């Protein structure tokens, strides 16, 4: 590689690093054109290479739905069962980049039985594209996906009214769907940002290039909006949240605390508070794998060295010196249930919260949510793909935020005790403890550990629920 090529490659890398990243998902009813939309975005931004096009043409002849034309939906419908049925089952992730921004796309299933897949895709996204068939208008799945998107903290919605070519590009149809959705959106979060774009994913109209067939629409194309939208972080994203994931002690002269800076900023010389012990200290060094930093930003993997020798454990939190965050042992959460095994009050699970694994007890199922009507339904159980609100009790005090304030420190996954399979995803609504640090209770800790022993090695005894009521009463 000559010097000019090296310089050009370095400039290209520098340019890529300076681009902002937007993560978004597509969702909607079955066959509204989600996969076709992504295929069109990739095709018209020249992200599909010649060899991919060759295989795409071949696959289109076997599994395509567009006759002799290339079926762009096959770009993301990767599973054989998806291609044969013409539907999306799994969450398909794709990456592409333009001159202005980098993107990660999650193409999520439209079928109700794949709600858990859709929730998985939405959990890491900043924006949601809701596909609506112009011929059919809003559907129950549109309502469901809108709610799940907002439940998982997404504040930006693009209502993509697709297949306008099949309704002769009539403005009246577009306006009616827009009106219906705005009425429905009043049931969702109050701080949503909603935009409506008429388009045809199949023909590429208003996706990357502006169409002349809808002169009544004076807005931007889909890509133009995605390239320019500025995602505003929540208020708590300015609050320092650094959970310790690893105690880094390679030799007797170095003791650091490694993890990912989930929110806020940190700099050398900063005075911080360590929770749950409520001890203050000062940052003396910030180290990465190849250099030292004066300051660290959100998302960076760092090792922090403190001025003082303090007993710090995995799962402890570094927060701002004036933070009012305190440990809590009881919370109300929204949960998406992801397994065939029914969730019942009295059960216990492991949860992973901010990198820390801890036992929780399901104290009460408050209600199940009908995601098609958004009505609260009284229920004593949650089944696969159900969404509900439950009250939980942690075996020990833990640190967390409300999910609406900080998605990174307000989410958890539920893990089955026996199989170690992920069975649910939880979003913390609020803490039920308002008294600050909770003192240790050795008797409770012993009973909790004793229960762990029984549930793991003697499940056939059939007594865990009775014991748990005693442990967490």
UniProtKB/Swiss-Prot annotation:
GO terms for molecular function: ATP binding; GTP binding; GTPase activity; sulfate adenylyltransferase (ATP) activity. Residues 19-238 form the tr-type G domain. Transmembrane segments: none annotated. Residues 107-110 are annotated as: G3. Residues 86-90 are annotated as: G2. GTP binds at residues 28-35, 107-111, 162-165. It catalyses: sulfate + ATP + H(+) = adenosine 5'-phosphosulfate + diphosphate. Its EC number is 2.7.7.4. Pathway: Sulfur metabolism; hydrogen sulfide biosynthesis; sulfite from sulfate: step 1/3. Residues 28-35 are annotated as: G1. Residues 162-165 are annotated as: G4. Residues 200-202 are annotated as: G5. It comes from the Bacteria. Signal peptide: none annotated. One of its GO terms (biological process) is hydrogen sulfide biosynthetic process. With CysD forms the ATP sulfurylase (ATPS) that catalyzes the adenylation of sulfate producing adenosine 5'-phosphosulfate (APS) and diphosphate, the first enzymatic step in sulfur assimilation pathway. APS synthesis involves the formation of a high-energy phosphoric-sulfuric acid anhydride bond driven by GTP hydrolysis by CysN coupled to ATP hydrolysis by CysD. Belongs to the TRAFAC class translation factor GTPase superfamily. Classic translation factor GTPase family. CysN/NodQ subfamily. HAMAP family: Sulf_adenylyltr_sub1 (MF_00062). Heterodimer composed of CysD, the smaller subunit, and CysN. This is Sulfate adenylyltransferase subunit 1. It comes from Buchnera aphidicola subsp. Acyrthosiphon pisum (strain APS). The lineage of its organism: Bacteria, Pseudomonadati, Pseudomonadota, Gammaproteobacteria, Enterobacterales. The gene is cysN.
């Amino acid at each position: 590689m000559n010097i000019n090529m090296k310089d050009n490659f370095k400039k290209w890398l520098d340019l890529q690093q300076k681009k902002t990243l937007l993560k978004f998902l597509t969702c909607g009813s079955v066959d509204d054109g989600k996969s076709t939309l992504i295929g069109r975005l990739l095709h018209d931004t020249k992200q599909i290479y010649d060899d991919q096009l060759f295989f795409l043409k071949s696959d289109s002849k076997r599994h395509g739905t567009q006759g002799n034309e290339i079926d762009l939906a096959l770009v993301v419908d990767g599973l054989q069962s998806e291609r044969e049925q013409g539907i999306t089952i799994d969450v398909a992730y794709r990456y592409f980049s333009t001159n202005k921004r980098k993107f990660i796309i999650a193409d999520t299933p439209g079928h109700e039985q794949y709600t858990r897949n859709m929730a998985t895709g939405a959990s890491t996204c900043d924006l949601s594209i809701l596909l609506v068939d112009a011929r059919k208008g809003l559907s129950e799945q549109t309502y469901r996906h809108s709610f799940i998107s907002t439940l998982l903290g997404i504040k930006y919605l693009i209502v993509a009214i697709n297949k306008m070519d099949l309704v002769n590009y009539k403005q009246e149809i577009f306006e009616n769907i827009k009106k219906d959705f705005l009425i429905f959106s009043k049931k969702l979060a109050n701080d949503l940002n909603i935009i409506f774009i008429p388009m045809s994913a199949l023909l590429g109209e208003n996706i990357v290039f502006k169409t002349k067939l809808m002169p009544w629409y004076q807005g931007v194309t889909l890509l133009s909006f995605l390239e320019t939208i500025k995602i505003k972080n929540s208020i708590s994203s300015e609050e320092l949240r650094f959970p310790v994931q690893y105690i880094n002690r390679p030799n007797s002269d170095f003791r650091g605390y490694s993890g990912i800076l989930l929110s806020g900023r940190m700099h050398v010389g900063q005075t911080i508070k360590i929770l749950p012990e409520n001890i203050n200290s000062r940052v003396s060094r910030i180290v990465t794998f190849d250099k030292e930093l004066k300051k660290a930003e959100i998302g960076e993997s760092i090792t922090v060295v403190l001025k003082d020798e303090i007993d710090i454990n995995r799962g402890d939190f570094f927060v701002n010196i004036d933070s009012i965050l305190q440990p809590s042992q009881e919370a109300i959460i929204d949960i998406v249930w992801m397994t065939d095994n029914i969730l019942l009050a009295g059960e216990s699970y492991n949860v992973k919260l901010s990198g820390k694994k801890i036992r929780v007890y399901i104290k009460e199922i408050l209600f199940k949510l009908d995601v098609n009507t958004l009505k609260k339904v009284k229920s004593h159980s949650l089944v696969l793909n159900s969404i509900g609100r439950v009250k939980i009790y942690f075996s020990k005090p833990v640190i967390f935020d409300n999910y609406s304030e900080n998605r990174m420190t307000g989410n958890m996954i539920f893990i089955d005790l026996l199989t170690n399979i992920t069975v649910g995803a939880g979003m913390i609504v609020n803490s039920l403890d308002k008294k600050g640090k909770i003192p240790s209770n050795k008797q409770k800790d012993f009973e909790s550990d004793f229960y762990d022993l029984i549930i793991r090695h003697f499940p056939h005894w059939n007594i865990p629920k009775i014991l748990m009521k005693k442990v967490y009463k």
